[in-house]
Curated annotation (Swiss-Prot):
Organism expressing this protein natively: Escherichia coli (strain K12)
Gene name tied to this protein: aceA
Assembly: Homotetramer.
Enzyme class, UniProt record, top EC level: lyase
Activity regulation note: Activated by phosphorylation on histidine. Competitively inhibited by 3-phosphosglycerate, oxalate, malate, chloride, phosphate and sulfate ions, and uncompetitively inhibited by succinate and phosphoenolpyruvate (PEP).
Pathway field: Carbohydrate metabolism; glyoxylate cycle; (S)-malate from isocitrate: step 1/2
Cofactor(s) required, per the database record: Mg(2+)
Effect of residue 195 to A: Large decrease in activity
GO annotation, cellular component aspect: cytosol
Residues given in the record as substrate binding sites: 91-93, 196-197, 232, 317-321, 351
Key words, A-Z: Glyoxylate bypass, Lyase, Magnesium, Manganese, Metal-binding, Phosphoprotein, Tricarboxylic acid cycle
Protein name: Isocitrate lyase
Signal peptide: none
Database matches in NCBIfam families: isocit_lyase (TIGR01346), PRK15063.1 (NF011645)
Family named by the database record: Belongs to the isocitrate lyase/PEP mutase superfamily. Isocitrate lyase family.
Length: 434
């Protein structure tokens, strides 16, 4: 076990590494170690994911940027890994709608239990672990052309932190302990938080938002994981703020007040740039939530951030809340992500891809199945396309194998001394028909 002094010296040395260039911490290594306790459990999956995410953002991604899809189940994330996606995005919106611990359906307004997103992070990582165990038990190892690196970095949504700085600190720890590689926090008032594409958004003062970023970074340091921290601002659209106490915000406050006591602000890109610049020293990536897929607005934000913080990594939400073909032509849509990457937006994601694909595909199947010729539509819409996708690496046609039946047959056989008459795949329809 390392002594307190050894931990402090090790942490001080770590903070001099290139990984932390440009990152501000308004606390000391002594402060961090003081909060750890004598035993600090390792968070292996979070460590691996954070390191992998950092490498992907610095030259190892296939396209020169990460383009991610939202997932809300372990199975969705598993299929993303098989298909070649490099990181998983886990949005609070999807968790609110269909994957929260209240077992209810909510809008994206922080109404669900705060530990719901960490629970889904854990669920996804458990699926990755099982898939890895299955291929490993089959003798498939790194270097084998059949090998899939299932442990994708998970970028998780902490919303507005579900409260104050202590809530943000505890939520960040929970995300890391569940295995998240990166976590984002936004600058809205948690008690009335909204989806970035809803109205009625209320900002907190800039310094309060910074303190939540500090809380999140401190939590990562206490756990000993180089978790990537993403700072999101909703200031492009939000025209309310809780207080006029922060001089940094004064140029945007109109003087008008609402019946709730909030102050009106001048929403827009200048307010968003102001906040992005304030957050940049405390975060690994900066994200400006926008109302439309606007390349010129994205360029203005990127240029302003990079004028003061050259090379600062940026994130962009390629949201399903945008009507893409209403805003852009097909050629621009096709080149949209590459153009963003050229501006420095190295993490791009479709927040609600998982829930839209899941709900639409089920509706499409159910509509045909209910109205038409029954099994014909299941075969045409699901089973035959699954068979056709096998050439691209899709394997869920053999659904028993996919979820681990063969793996647990091996467990049974080992326990029973090498032979068993009760293994599940032998004699199954999957064995005989697929």
């Amino acid at each position: 076990m390392k002594t307190r002094t050894q931990q402090i010296e090790e942490l001080q040395k770590e903070w001099t590494q290139p990984r932390w260039e440009g990152i501000t911490r308004p606390y000391s290594a002594e402060d961090v170690v003081k909060l750890r306790g004598s035993v600090n459990p390792e968070c292996t999956l979070a460590q691996l994911g954070a390191a992998k995410m950092w490498r992907l953002l610095h030259g190892e991604s296939k396209k020169g940027y990460i383009n991610s899809l939202g997932a809300l189940t372990g199975g969705q994330a598993l299929q993303q890994a098989k298909a070649g996606i490099e990181a998983v995005y886990l949005s609070g919106w999807q968790v609110a709608a269909d994957a929260n611990l209240a077992a209810s359906m909510y809008p994206d307004q922080s109404l669900y239990p705060a530990n719901s997103v960490p629970a889904v992070v854990e669920r996804i990582n458990n699926t990755f672990r099982r898939a890895d165990q299955i291929q490993w038990s089959a003798g498939i190892e790194p270097g084998d052309p059949r090998y899939v690196d299932y442990f994708l970095p998970i970028v998780a949504d902490a919303e507005a932190g579900f409260g104050g700085v202590l809530n943000a600190f505890e939520l960040m720890k929970a995300m890391i302990e569940a295995g998240a590689a990166a976590v984002h926090f936004e600058d809205q008032l948690a008690s009335v938080k909204k989806c970035g594409h809803m109205g009625g958004k209320v900002l907190v003062p800039t310094q309060e938002a910074i303190q939540k970023l500090v809380a999140a970074r401190l939590a990562a340091d206490v756990t000993g994981v180089p978790t990537l921290l993403v700072a999101r601002t909703d200031a492009d659209a939000a025209d309310l703020i809780t207080s006029d106490c922060d001089p940094y915000d004064s140029e945007f406050i109109t003087g008008e007040r609402t019946s709730e006591g909030f102050f009106r602000t001048h929403a827009g890109i200048e307010q968003a740039i102001s906040r992005g610049l304030a957050y940049a020293p405390y975060a690994d990536l900066v994200w400006c939530e926008t109302s439309t897929p606007d390349l010129e607005l994205a360029r203005r934000f990127a240029q302003a951030i990079h004028a003061k913080y050259p090379g600062k990594l940026l994130a962009y939400n390629c949201s399903p809340s945008f009507n893409w073909q209403k805003n852009l032509d097909d050629k621009t849509i096709a080149s949209f992500q590459q153009q963003l990457s050229d501006m420095g937006y190295k993490f791009q994601f479709i927040t609600l891809a998982g829930i839209h694909s899941m709900w639409f595909n089920m509706f499409d199947l159910a509509n045909a199945y209910a109205q038409g010729e029954g099994m014909k539509h299941y075969v045409e819409k699901v089973q035959q396309p699954e068979f056709a996708a096998a050439k691209d690496g899709y394997t869920f046609v053999s659904h028993q194998q996919e979820v681990g039946t063969g793996y647990f047959d091996k467990v049974t056989t080992i326990i029973q001394g090498g032979t068993s008459s009760v293994t599940a795949l032998t004699g199954s329809t999957e064995e005989s028909q697929f």
